[in-house]
A protein has these predicted regions:
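N-terminal single-pass transmembrane signal-anchor helix
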Residues: 1-15
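N-terminal helix-rich module
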Residues: 10, 16-34, 41, 45, ...
């Protein structure tokens, strides 16, 4: 009986730990999307275009502002593993995106597809 109780307790605690890791990874994805939304808002607020350069197998997104600033943005605990149809994303001064596409983001052992919609610059994710 004691062995059964110990096994049950261990399985419940590991379930909670794996759930916690998944929720933490989704939080990282939401933080990335929030940062991308910030770049869109900055483009609108400063009346300029902002271009994001996406590279396969990279944890860095390069940012180029129309007014000349260039800098890198680091993806926390993740990296881009695949880029589909979109190597650059440009938010114009109205906040729309120049083209649609997606990239695969790996956060620890979980994969997420980050999807850019051309209409109104919408960004969303789907767990793979």
């Amino acid at each position: 009986m004691l062995v059964l109780t110990i096994l049950l307790q261990l399985s419940l605690s590991s379930f909670n730990f794996s759930t916690l890791l998944r929720v933490n990874d989704e939080l990282k994805v939401n933080q990335l999307i929030t940062q991308l939304e910030y770049f869109k808002s900055k483009a609108i607020g400063e009346n300029q275009s902002i271009t994001l350069l996406l590279s396969k197998n990279s944890s860095v997104i390069k940012v180029i502002e129309q007014k000349g600033k260039k800098y890198n943005f680091k993806i926390l605990d993740g990296k881009i593993t695949y880029v589909s149809k979109v190597k650059t994303i440009t938010f114009n001064k109205e906040g729309t995106i120049n083209n649609f596409g997606s990239f695969i983001l790996q956060v620890h052992n979980h994969l997420y597809r980050i999807i850019f919609h051309i209409d109104k610059g919408r960004i969303r994710y789907a767990k793979i």
